[in-house]
A protein has these predicted regions:
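C-terminal motif of bacterial Sec signal peptides marking the signal peptidase cleavage site
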Residues: 19-22
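Beta-alpha junction/loop-to-helix N-cap segments that form part of ligand/metal-binding clefts
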Residues: 26-31, 52-56, 71-155, 228-235, ...
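Solvent-exposed loop/turn segments at secondary-structure junctions
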Residues: 46-49, 84-88, 118-123, 141-146, ...
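Segments of small-molecule ligand-sensing domains
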Residues: 321-334, 345-403
Length: 411
């Protein structure tokens, strides 16, 4: 699939064309009442394990820019894609994430920041963009502590907002909503007792906390709540401990990784009866197919994206335009990146004559109500969270992940 724009010598995309307009920084000056050219940045890992989906997300952002018509009132808008990864590391790095956020903050024309992909990366970039009063919207960071109490670390969410003002939101449901969907899915599968392990990352720990709180409300007993170092090669001892608890199911809260695959395999070998559950982080055909067939067939995962036939018409139209423009189907996260971009552009438009004012654009974002979009109709609450609450409960077949249940979380 077509590649995105690199962080080094980052290239600028104008709204008027789906092409690189040239390399270099955004304009440094604007009229006295504010810049007439605005820059929207994205920060995504374009190399390594997340490279393919990040490239699709960048392409979705580019498509939203192309469709926006060239200008928003008297304002021109440009796009700069920043790479939060390196070819050597093969994933996002703290240094790159921080450098990207600083790049945006130093640009007086910057109006919004789309990213990061992972919650742990967003936890690094957000305090910087917040100090710069730049609206930041993540297409995929779900950690509760970014927006509300309930995370796994102290002083959250306050530590992410040194300016004292809220400047962050997301177009994907937060982990407390996802946890409710997961527990609901477990209940439909007859689960009464679940063993729960997480990785030691921000996302995994936070999701595990939410799952441990949600399960008893649905009559499901959490038998184990521990964490594991996914860098280990052998999880047989830990898996044996899980099996001794005699659960109906096993849930791993954490990012997709070779270590996560080894955990599922070890638990499945220790107890061949168990159903295996996973979050949206592992709701990926490539990850599930990396598991032995006997293990994959016991996997149950949830994802915020329903199959195309159940998506809004606007989502199906986006899919067709993406395929026609870039020569292949988009990953599910591309739809979220597209909507994040459209939401930024519409927030600039809603700010009217103050569309070049960061605070006014942020206020317009938080005023989002009953918005019809490719993701469905939603509102943004005072925390910056979306009201979207529908998930796909998927199971593995020979053809890949297929829909098993549509899960709707009560508001």
């Amino acid at each position: 699939m077509a590649g995105g724009l690199r962080a080094v010598g980052a290239c600028v995309l104008t709204v008027a064309a789906l092409a690189v307009a040239g390399c270099g920084g955004a304009d440094d000056a604007g009229p006295q009442d504010g810049p007439s050219t605005l820059t929207i940045y994205s920060s995504l890992p374009l190399h390594g394990v997340d490279g393919e989906r990040s490239h699709d997300m960048v392409n979705a952002i580019k498509l939203a820019f192309q469709e926006s018509g060239g200008k928003i009132g008297p304002l021109s808008v440009t796009y700069v894609s920043l790479d939060s990864s390196t070819p050597k590391d093969g994933t996002w790095t703290s240094d790159r994430v921080l450098d990207n956020a600083r790049t945006a903050v130093r640009d007086l024309n910057a109006i919004a920041y789309i990213g990061d992909l992972d919650s742990a990366a967003t936890a690094l970039s957000l305090p910087l963009t917040n100090e710069g009063h730049i609206l930041q919207i993540s297409p995929s960071s779900t950690y509760d502590g970014l927006t509300r109490p309930g995370g796994s670390r102290p002083a959250e969410p306050e530590r992410f907002y040194p300016s004292g003002q809220r400047t962050f939101g997301r177009v994907v449901a937060a982990d407390h909503v996802q946890a409710a969907a997961l527990v609901g899915y477990m209940k439909t599968q007859g689960v009464r007792r679940v063993a729960l392990l997480s990785d030691r990352d921000l996302y995994g720990g936070g999701l595990a906390e939410q799952l441990a709180a949600a399960a008893p409300r649905e009559g499901i007993q959490v038998l184990d709540r521990g964490d594991v170092d996914v860098r280990k090669r052998d999880f047989s001892d830990r898996a044996a401990d899980v099996a001794k608890l005699d659960p109906d199911a096993f849930m791993f809260a954490g990012e997709a990784s070779p270590g996560a695959a080894r955990i599922y395999e070890a638990v499945a070998e220790a107890d061949p009866r168990l159903l295996l559950f996973g979050s949206d982080a592992v709701a990926d055909d490539a990850f599930v197919r990396s598991l032995p067939v006997a293990v994959a067939r016991r996997m149950r995962v949830i994802a915020p994206a329903l199959p195309p036939r159940l998506q809004p018409r606007a989502a199906r139209e986006f899919d067709a335009r993406f395929r026609a423009t870039f020569g292949g189907p988009p990953v599910p996260e591309a739809l979220q990146a597209y909507e994040a971009t459209r939401l930024v552009l519409d927030s600039i438009r809603a700010a009217g004559g103050r569309g070049n004012d960061r605070a006014a654009v942020t206020d317009a974002f938080f005023a989002t109500r009953d918005r019809r979009s490719v993701l469905g109709t939603y509102s943004i609450d005072r925390f910056g969270d979306t009201s979207l609450n529908t998930f796909a409960g998927d199971r593995m077949t020979r053809s890949g992940l297929v829909l098993d249940k549509v899960l709707r979380v009560k508001p």
